[in-house]
Amino acid sequence: MKNQHILFGICGSFCNHAAVLKEFEKLCEENDVQAVDSENVFTCNTRFFQHEDFISRLEKASHKPVIHTIVEAEKVGPSNAYDIMIIAPMSATVAAKMVLGIYDHPVTLAAKAMLRNNRNIVFGIASNDGLSISAKNIFTLINLKHFFVIPFAQDAPFEKERSIVSKWNLLEKTADM
């Protein structure tokens, strides 16, 4: 994948941020990438990352400030500046919001704007209940026009039999349509 204008949404599943960050940094080497983060990603310190460190790495790789407000995300539609959107990781909550048309945070509003512009959205799911109550929304997204899923599997089938995580090493290959 080269010379693409990529909008890259980052949501919860904080334990997946390190793996997703590697893929983000690789995409930035040969593409124009703009990060858009959920409020929690932008503000929460977790056992996996201090938010300042995570944001700093995104901005260093992309050479752009992270979009992190509704006001900033609203500009995505009229600008029509992006070829594709990647949302990784996408939480089950964000999957539900997308299916139900709830655009109340930066990533979901940016995704709505991409759909308005007839652009594709590639998403990587990470959810402890992806094969349980959240399966309905995840599989609904998979069947909607303009949505493509990064292949996923159970991440701990004997300890967390309902948990699924996308194979982050297939992110770029999935997005390179």
Feature map (PLM): residue ranges:
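A cross-family phosphate/adenosyl-ligand binding-site feature
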Residues: M1-I121, A126-M177
